[in-house]
Amino acid sequence: MKPSSPSRSKGHAKARRKTREELNQEARDRKRQKKRRGHAPGSRAAGGNNTSGSKGQNAPKDPRIGSKTPIPLGVTEKVTKQHKPKSEKPMLSPQAELELLETDERLDALLERLEAGETLSAEEQSWVDAKLDRIDELMQKLGLSYDDDEEEEEDEKQEDMMRLLRGN
């Protein structure tokens, strides 16, 4: 009798041997991959790892490289920039400013409210006072007064009376 050999179970199937064609194809693939190893042709002169052009395009450029701003080579004096003064309101002639104040809608509305007997807030009242004071100043500069119209009417009435008395 033969000594019994360990029994092989069906679970451990024998590995299939590759055919000569399959072995040759695998060898060709390995050789092709081995040929591709190393640097790309011309990489020594071109200077680097840029195997494909897309690599350089995706990388963000360093802003410090290639600045086009001129750099002074000699010692130069610093040019101090003069700050422009903030634009102030253009100076109007007293006559133009007076006309603007007389046609001011907000001032008219607040004065009408005052005449109607309403009380204004402290802020509104101070604004009205400031505007009325400015109108007084301008009228004094221009030599006008509130009573000019009334005086003219009185002067005309007196002239009319004088004409009547003279008998013209």
Curated annotation (Swiss-Prot):
Subunit structure comment from the entry: Interacts with Der.
Keywords assigned by UniProt, alphabetized: GTPase activation, Ribosome biogenesis
Superkingdom of source: Bacteria
GO biological process: ribosome biogenesis
Function recorded in the entry: A GTPase-activating protein (GAP) that modifies Der/EngA GTPase function. May play a role in ribosome biogenesis.
Basic residues bias: start-end ranges: 9-18, 30-39
Entry annotated with the keyword Transmembrane: no
Polar residues biased stretches: 48-57
Family statement: Belongs to the YihI family.
InterPro entries assigned: YihI
UniProt source species: Escherichia coli O157:H7
Bias (Acidic residues) ranges: 146-158
This protein's name: Der GTPase-activating protein YihI
